[in-house]
Structures are given as structure tokens and as C-alpha cells.
């Protein structure tokens, strides 16, 4: 049985022991590794630092009968200490995190883990050497190895919690199929497939997902391949959809309870979008540790991954709802949900007090004029204010940062209650509640940002939101362009939204994404090449400040169309054939347009 020990100080280490010390941000390099013990050092110069994702990764590396030591001074008051990790998820501000650490402490007590200044057992010794493990497949793995190749389904989804041998199984399956089929492999990270390749003991061609899509689009790869997708839920859904609908047979593996937040909503969403026969296979038997391992159970409850336990508090219930209804819900989301500043929640329950749906929102705007102008000029990028800053930069709308707004970060409805109007009613109730609660200083607008699909665009339009921006490129996390929509509340907000819509629609036909999204948007757009005052303001910020090419794309395009012969330096921006030294080229572009600024 594995152990977790909380230590208040770092004890002396025996001679001959070499510790491999790494920053929390590099924890992913330990995925797939196994150790008899590990140290997780929470100490920080200004308090503590607890990266939940890194902690979950390290838990998964501890072998049976191994120990994870958590170094935490003043454990008795940990919930009162400043957690420096909050800088990542709390708008750049470190804060105390009482709600999360109360949750943490409750579970330490529940599972009876040791909290001490000195461990009862001898501390870290030189690890014993173990003979190399021979691969022995469990009955579950053997069953899949025998039955999956004979099953006629076109899509096979292998799911399991961590440490169940998915990658080993996938490697053996790939080896079997390679005897008669052309087998290829893809994954979110090439580093994650080493276990598959080691088990397969043959060379399986690997392609990054975007490379594979490019080969499909240029007709350089046949559909007559068998594709393995490792940790499929880490890959954006639109990419999975294209891959899953192209190759003749696809085998996906993914972790159901994962530090990366793959979410239980993954299978629901993927299967709906794949119009092919599908079969699911599951692994339950842990290989790295024993059944009912306390450390695994503790971590699952810490990350709110246990479906069988009914959450006691509203935050935990809401997190479960997000995990069920959304594609990705991460450990960082959990930390933010428990303790981040500037958050707002609105939920609705049925008569049995079951959480039906909820909105998670954050406050934005009300920044000073000096800061707003610095953001517009490209000189400042403070954390937070996602939509407000984007509209200020990409939309050339400085006032977006100064007005008072609320951004709907997440909206979720229980999967069995979707498409019944509950989400729309929730949005209506939330907006009425926000207006009522902000009478002293009225809200100017409510915003939302989401991966643009026809379904979601229709939903938000039906609820009165107006489209004001679309990201020029697809977001790596979702695989979609992100849309930003606003609902005006105050008179000032109405004037602002009217202006934002007008500018967006004026620029739309010149945007690089317009041909792709034209049918989805259903907005009649005409090319308008004549410069106006907003364009000149935009170009002044590009030429004499630090506004980016993306921020000024349409204004630069209008200027280029009018003065093409004199501004050949701008051509790469519109042909997407950039010079090798882009930094030098960018500065040359800034200088080149200065004579044209009015």
C-alpha cells in the first residue's frame, strides 16, 4: 500500500542518494516513470507553492509500497498561508487558499495519512535495484487483445484510470495489427507514446495531429490505415472528428480520471460527432499499485474525480457538473473554482436539490485609463480580463477595459437535461440577478467567449448576445476559432456594443478566417477598402507603439490595397509567406507605414 507523509521540514538525506530536482512546470516529463519515493516540496520564499497538476502527476509515479513525502512547513495553518501558485490562475496575484486546503486537510484526516516533523520509517534510502519487469498481461488486457481485432466496429475507445496499462495494451495491439495492416500513431505529445513503442517492439510511424490533418487535406495519405490515437481526450475535438471519420479503423486510448482534465464529457461529445460504429473497452485492474490503494483514492477525491461520492458543497457539485458536461475541466480550474478572486456563480436545482445547471462567471473591466491605453498600445498585458483585453487590442476598442463587465466563463447543463431550454432560462435569470446586484454602479455589458460552432452561435444569438470578435486563428486547446459576443445592459454599454458590432462587421470580409466561417456566421459582409479614423488610430499604434500585426491586420490590409506598389514590405502578411527573420521584418513594417500616417 502506498503512503503519503506530510513533513514540516526537510530531513537529512542518506549519503549516496541522488535527488533529481525539477520545477513543477516540468512535471510532465515524469509521466510513465516509476519511483519508490518522491519529495514534493511546497516551500516558497513568500509562503507556499502547491501546483495541483504536478502533485497528481507525481502521485502516479509512486510504486506499490512507495511513499510520497510532502514538505509543508506550518501544516496546521496552511490554509492561511499565501500560495504563490495562485499567480498562474488568479490574475497574477498570489492569495491564501482556505477553501482548497480545508478540502485537502479533510481528506488527509479521512485517509489517516501521517503528519509529522520526522517520519516513523527511515527517510529516503538508496532505492533497491529491481530486475527488469517482464510484461505480463492481466486477464482484462488479454480479453481485449483477443476480442478487439475480431470486432467489426470502426472506432474503438479504450478507457481507464491512470496506471492500468492502456499504453502497454495499445503497443501490443499495434504490434498485432502491423502484421496485416498499415498502422500509424498520433498523440498530443510525441513524448507520451514511448510506452507504446517500447511494447510494440517494432517501428510504428508517428505523426503529430496537425501534420496528419495536412496529409489528409492534401491527399498524401490513404484512408486505408489503422490509426492509434494515444490520450485522445487531450486532442481538440474537431481534429478527433476529422481523424475518426477518415481512417478505416481508429483505436483511441484515453484516461478517464486525469490530471489534465480530459473530463467525463469526452466520450459523450466524441461519439455524438462520429457517424461510425463504435465499441468501448475498459481497464479497471491497477498495475503499478494494489486495488483500493489509499493514495489513489485520496488523489481522486482531492481532484473531485470520484463519481460515486456525492459532493457535499456547492463548489464541488458544480465542478462535477462541469466535468460531466464539458470536454476539459482541469486541476487549475479546480483551484480557481475553490479560491480565485472576482468570481460569480449562478446555479439552478430541481425539487430534489439536484444541481441541474450552472454558470461560472468572472468580473472584468473597470481598469484605469492609463492601463487601458497601455494595453491597447501593446505595452502591458496584465493577467485576467480576457474579453475586455481582447476587444481593446484586437477590436481597437480601448473603452472595453474601462467599462464594467462580467464574462460568462462556463455554462453547463446536466447531459440528460440538455436541449430543454434550461440553459437559456439560466442565462436570463443570471443577467437579471447581475443587474439587481449592481445597482450602485450598473453593469455595462455581459460577455462570453467560446469555440465557434453553428450550435453555440445560435444558442447565444437566441439569448440576445451580439457577435463582436473572432480570433484570427484556431485555438490550440479547442481546435476552433473563438467567438466573443456581448449583451449590453447600461446605456453606455448599448452604445459600446453598437460600435463594436459595426467595427467587426466592417472588417469581417477582410479577415483571413471569413471564407472558412462565412456560411456559419450568416452575416452579409462587403469588402470596405476605404480608410476611416479608426484605421488611422490603429495604424498609428502599430507604427509608433507596439500594436501587433494581428491587432492591425484589416487596417494594414486597407492601406496595402491603396498603396500596394509602395508597401511591398507588407505582402508577406497577406500571403502568409513570412521572412526568416520576422522580428527585423516587423520593425521594417512599422517604419515603412509611418510616412502614410495622417
From Swiss-Prot:
Q: Look at the named UniProt entry and state the broad enzyme category this protein falls under.
A: transferase
Task: Report the GO molecular function annotations.
Answer: 18S rRNA cytidine N-acetyltransferase activity; ATP binding; tRNA binding; tRNA N4-acetyltransferase activity
Residue span(s) of domain N-acetyltransferase: 332-490
Q: Which PROSITE patterns match?
A: GNAT (PS51186)
> Which parts of the sequence bind acetyl-CoA?
411-413, 418-424, 462
A GO biological-process term: rRNA acetylation involved in maturation of SSU-rRNA
Where does the protein end up? Answer: Cytoplasm
Q: Name one Pfam family in it.
A: NAT10_TcmA_helicase
Q: Which GO terms describe its cellular component?
A: cytoplasm
InterPro entries, per the entry: Acyl_CoA_acyltransferase, GNAT_dom, NAT10/TcmA_helicase, P-loop_NTPase, TmcA/NAT10/Kre33, TmcA_C_sf, TmcA_tRNA_bind, tRNA_acetyltr_TmcA
Coiled-coil segments = none
Kindly state which keywords UniProt assigns to this record, in alphabetical order: Acyltransferase, ATP-binding, Cytoplasm, Nucleotide-binding, RNA-binding, Transferase, tRNA processing, tRNA-binding
EC number(s) recorded for this UniProt protein: 2.3.1.193
> Which Gene3D superfamilies is this protein grouped with?
3.40.50.11040, 3.40.630.30, P-loop containing nucleotide triphosphate hydrolases (3.40.50.300), tRNA(Met) cytidine acetyltransferase, tail domain (1.20.120.890)
Annotated residues for binding of ATP: 141, 163-172, 288
Family, according to the entry, reads as follows: Belongs to the RNA cytidine acetyltransferase family. TmcA subfamily.
Report the function annotation for this chain.
Catalyzes the formation of N(4)-acetylcytidine (ac(4)C) at the wobble position of tRNA(Met), by using acetyl-CoA as an acetyl donor and ATP (or GTP).
- Entry protein name: tRNA(Met) cytidine acetyltransferase TmcA
Amino acid at each position: 500500500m502506498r503512503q503519503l507523509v506530510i513533513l514540516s521540514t526537510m530531513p537529512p538525506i542518506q549519503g549516496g542518494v541522488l535527488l533529481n530536482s525539477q520545477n513543477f512546470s516540468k512535471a510532465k516529463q515524469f509521466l510513465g516513470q516509476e519511483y519508490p519515493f518522491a519529495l514534493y516540496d511546497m516551500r516558497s520564499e513568500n509562503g507556499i507553492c502547491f501546483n495541483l497538476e504536478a502533485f497528481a502527476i507525481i502521485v502516479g509515479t509512486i510504486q506499490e509500497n512507495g511513499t510520497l513525502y510532502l514538505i509543508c512547513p506550518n501544516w496546521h495553518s496552511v490554509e492561511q498561508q499565501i500560495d504563490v501558485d495562485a499567480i498562474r490562475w488568479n490574475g497574477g496575484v498570489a492569495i491564501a487558499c482556505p477553501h482548497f486546503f480545508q478540502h485537502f486537510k479533510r481528506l488527509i484526516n479521512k485517509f489517516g495519512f501521517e503528519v509529522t516533523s520526522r517520519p516513523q520509517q527511515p527517510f529516503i534510502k538508496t532505492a533497491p535495484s529491481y530486475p527488469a519487469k517482464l510484461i505480463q498481461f492481466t486477464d482484462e488486457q488479454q480479453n481485449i487483445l483477443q476480442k478487439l481485432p475480431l470486432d467489426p466496429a470502426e472506432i474503438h475507445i479504450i478507457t481507464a484510470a491512470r496506471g492500468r496499462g492502456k499504453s502497454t495494451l495499445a503497443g501490443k495491439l499495434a504490434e498485432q495489427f502491423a502484421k496485416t495492416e498499415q498502422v500509424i500513431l498520433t498523440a498530443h505529445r510525441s513524448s507520451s507514446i514511448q510506452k507504446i513503442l517500447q511494447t510494440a517492439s517494432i517501428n510504428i510511424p508517428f505523426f503529430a495531429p496537425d501534420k496528419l490533418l495536412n496529409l489528409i487535406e492534401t491527399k498524401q495519405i490513404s484512408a486505408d490505415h489503422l490509426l492509434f490515437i494515444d490520450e485522445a481526450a487531450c486532442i481538440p475535438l474537431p481534429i478527433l472528428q476529422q481523424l475518426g471519420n477518415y481512417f478505416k479503423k481508429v483505436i483511441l486510448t484515453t484516461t478517464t480520471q486525469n490530471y489534465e482534465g480530459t473530463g467525463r464529457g469526452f466520450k459523450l461529445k466524441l461519439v455524438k460527432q462520429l457517424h461510425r460504429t463504435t465499441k468501448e473497452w475498459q481497464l479497471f485492474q491497477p498495475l503499478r499499485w494494489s486495488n483500493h490503494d489509499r493514495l489513489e483514492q485520496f488523489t481522486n477525491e482531492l481532484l473531485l474525480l470520484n463519481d460515486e461520492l456525492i459532493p457535499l458543497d456547492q463548489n464541488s457539485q458544480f465542478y462535477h457538473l462541469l466535468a460531466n458536461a464539458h470536454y476539459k475541466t482541469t486541476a487549475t480550474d479546480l483551484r480557481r473554482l475553490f479560491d480565485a478572486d472576482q468570481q460569480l456563480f449562478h446555479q439552478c436545482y430541481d425539487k430534489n436539490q439536484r444541481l441541474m445547471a450552472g454558470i461560472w462567471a468572472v468580473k472584468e473591466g473597470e481598469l484605469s485609463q492609463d492601463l487601458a491605453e497601455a494595453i491597447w498600445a501593446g505595452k502591458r498585458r496584465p493577467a485576467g480580463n480576457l474579453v475586455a483585453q481582447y476587444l481593446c487590442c484586437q477590436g481597437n476598442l480601448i473603452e472595453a477595459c474601462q467599462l464594467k463587465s462580467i464574462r460568462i466563463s462556463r455554462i453547463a447543463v446536466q447531459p440528460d437535461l440538455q436541449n430543454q431550454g434550461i440553459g437559456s432560462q439560466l442565462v436570463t435569470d443570471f443577467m437579471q440577478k447581475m443587474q439587481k446586484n449592481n445597482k450602485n454602479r450598473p453593469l455595462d455589458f455581459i460577455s462570453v467567449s467560446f469555440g465557434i460552432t453553428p450550435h453555440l452561435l445560435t444558442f447565444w444569438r437566441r439569448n440576445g448576445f451580439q457577435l463582436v470578435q473572432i480570433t484570427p486563428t484556431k485555438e490550440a486547446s479547442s481546435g476552433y476559432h473563438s467567438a466573443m459576443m456581448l449583451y449590453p445592459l447600461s446605456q453606455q454599454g448599448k452604445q459600446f456594443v453598437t460600435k463594436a458590432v459595426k467595427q467587426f462587421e466592417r472588417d469581417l470580409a477582410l479577415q483571413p478566417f471569413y471564407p472558412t466561417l462565412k456560411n456559419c456566421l450568416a452575416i452579409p459582409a462587403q469588402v470596405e477598402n476605404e480608410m476611416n479614423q479608426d484605421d488611422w488610430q490603429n495604424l498609428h499604434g502599430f507604427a509608433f507603439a507596439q500594436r501587433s500585426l494581428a491587432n492591425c491586420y484589416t487596417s494594414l490590409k486597407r492601406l496595402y490595397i491603396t498603396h500596394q506598389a509602395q508597401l511591398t514590405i507588407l505582402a508577406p502578411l497577406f500571403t502568409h509567406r513570412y521572412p526568416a527573420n520576422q522580428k527585423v521584418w516587423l520593425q521594417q513594417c512599422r517604419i515603412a507605414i509611418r510616412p502614410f500616417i495622417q
